Design a protein with these regions (language model features):
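Bacterial N-terminal signal peptides that target proteins for export
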Residues: 1-9
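Asparagine-centered strand-capping/turn motif at beta-strand->loop junctions
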Residues: 34-35
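Tryptophan-paired
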Residues: 44-91
Length: 166
């Protein structure tokens, strides 16, 4: 009976190092955002993390931020959840005048919007950075690429300055 217990313990101890081989290898990629709408994106999260602030209409949100973690190898079931908030609006009174409290305008924050979207196929050669694209009608796309959104071969194309603006 004791020999069986010893055999089970030895088997478990031998298998533990192998379990590390079964873990999916991941990589941390810097991320950025491109806004294809005419509204500000004040903040966004990727899978509940992040907090990049102020992605301007029809433009990018400045430098890249570290990091979003992805598997080194793409799989067809990959999805990410993007949650974002618009820039808000200044509170106005019944006459349309901006409300001032304590000497400051009052900002009414936009509600948070959340979408879970597929991650398009990528290869090891694409593992440069992760870009979130805010599209019209509260849609969002993501992309893993070594190209930056301003590159002529990058799709979706970087917004042209002044496009869709009043």
């Amino acid at each position: 009976m004791h020999w069986r217990l010893g055999l089970i313990a030895a088997t478990v101890l031998l298998c533990l190092p192998l379990s590390a081989c079964l873990e999916e290898e991941t990589i941390g990629l810097s991320y950025q955002a491109v806004n294809h709408t005419d509204q500000w994106v004040s903040s966004f999260l990727i899978n509940g993390e992040g907090g990049v602030i102020n992605v301007p209409p029809q433009g990018g949100g400045g430098a890249t931020t570290c990091c979003v973690t992805l598997p080194r190898r793409w799989n067809p079931d990959m999805k990410v959840t993007i949650k974002w908030q618009g820039g808000g609006k200044w509170l106005t009174d019944a006459d349309g005048k901006e409300v001032i409290r304590d000497g400051r305008q009052v900002l009414v924050e936009d509600p948070w919007i959340e979408r879970t979207v597929p991650v398009p196929e990528y290869t090891a050669q694409d593992l440069g950075h992760f870009t979130v694209h805010f599209m019209p009608n509260n849609q969002v796309q993501v992309k893993v690429s070594v190209l930056y959104p301003e590159h002529p071969e990058y799709l979706p194309a970087y917004p042209k300055q002044g496009a869709n603006q009043p």
